[in-house]
Amino acid sequence: MRHSTTLTGCATGAAGLLAATAAAAQQQSLEIIGRPQPGGTGFQPSASPVATQIHWLDGFILVIIAAITIFVTLLILYAVWRFHEKRNKVPARFTHNSPLEIAWTIVPIVILVAIGAFSLPVLFNQQEIPEADVTVKVTGYQWYWGYEYPDEEISFESYMIGSPATGGDNRMSPEVEQQLIEAGYSRDEFLLATDTAMVVPVNKTVVVQVTGADVIHSWTVPAFGVKQDAVPGRLAQLWFRAEREGIFFGQCSELCGISHAYMPITVKVVSEEAYAAWLEQARGGTYELSSVLPATPAGVSVE
């Protein structure tokens, strides 16, 4: 477990709230949804409207790119075959072809306009921050994340399980594997799972305010379609609305120093009831947040 982790909030009734709400939290069986797959080449499953739009746009542009690639490849192969010296004894001497030149000017313009017409609404949807149901401030540090719920007076830090802050050395060991198991994970989640998690309710608009404390980091959760640089001295915003309950992993996506690879992100999306129970417990005082809402492997409930 982490050597020293604190929560700021009301200091009274911590033990009572912990006992009262742990049972409610443990009834929440959370499937691990947003995570990289060995040998995977595609996107993680979409879990927000923003991610769904990005996936559609990627597929749309991929069709255009594939068509252009196939057309150009076939054109080159035809030119090599048709105008080979053996088949073209007398080389052509024309200098231009006006209809062809007009066509290869207009067609790219039409393609670019089409891409832009479908891309801009997706971009604007990401940049237009709606009214928040939940606001979370995220601060990037070397090499961990800090989370603050300003409306709830809750704040905590999040370290990778197996990092020096949790008693490890960023390598898998029997002790680290035991920590993962105690948190509800398996060794497959090493380098992804954290000792505490950002917890949000399902189907609610979450606005995340992102900043950095030392160098530039980047808070990224692929399943939500969000990535925002955490720049010291600046406060940026992103938003998402998770459409399904589960556990979603992300990672710092901006090279930030020697332990850049060891600052993952864990987001747990839960029901409104479980979220309310978590808030009540989290306000209770100082304890390990990993006990607030156990991470549970897919289909496994904690009894």
Swiss-Prot record:
Question: Which cysteine pairs are joined by S-S bonds?
Answer: none
Q: How is the cofactor bound?
A: Binds a copper A center.
Q: What class of enzyme is it?
A: translocase
Q: Where in the cell is it found?
A: Cell membrane
State a single Gene Ontology molecular function: cytochrome-c oxidase activity
Q: Provide the cofactor list for this protein.
A: Cu cation
Q: Note the InterPro entries from the entry.
A: CcO_II, CcO_II-like_C, Copper_CuA, Cupredoxin, Cyt_c_oxidase_su2, Cyt_c_oxidase_su2_TM_dom, Cyt_c_oxidase_su2_TM_sf
Hey, which family's this protein in? Belongs to the cytochrome c oxidase subunit 2 family.
Q: Where is the signal peptide?
A: 1-25
For this UniProt record, give its keywords in alphabetical order, as a comma-separated list. Cell membrane, Copper, Electron transport, Membrane, Metal-binding, Respiratory chain, Signal, Translocase, Transmembrane, Transmembrane helix, Transport
- Give binding positions for Cu cation: H217, C252, C256, H260
Give membrane topology per the record: Multi-pass membrane protein
Query: Where are the annotated coiled coils located?
Result: none
GO cellular component terms, alphabetically, are: plasma membrane
Origin organism is: Cereibacter sphaeroides (Rhodobacter sphaeroides)
Under Enzyme Commission nomenclature, its number is 7.1.1.9
Q: Which residues cross the membrane?
A: 60-80, 104-124
Q: Which reaction does it catalyse?
A: 4 Fe(II)-[cytochrome c] + O2 + 8 H(+)(in) = 4 Fe(III)-[cytochrome c] + 2 H2O + 4 H(+)(out)
Physiological role: Subunits I and II form the functional core of the enzyme complex. Electrons originating in cytochrome c are transferred via heme a and Cu(A) to the binuclear center formed by heme a3 and Cu(B).
Transmembrane keyword on record:
yes
Q: Which gene encodes it?
A: ctaC
What GO terms describe the biological role, i.e. biological process, of this protein?
A: ATP synthesis coupled electron transport
Q: Can you say what this protein is called?
A: Cytochrome c oxidase subunit 2
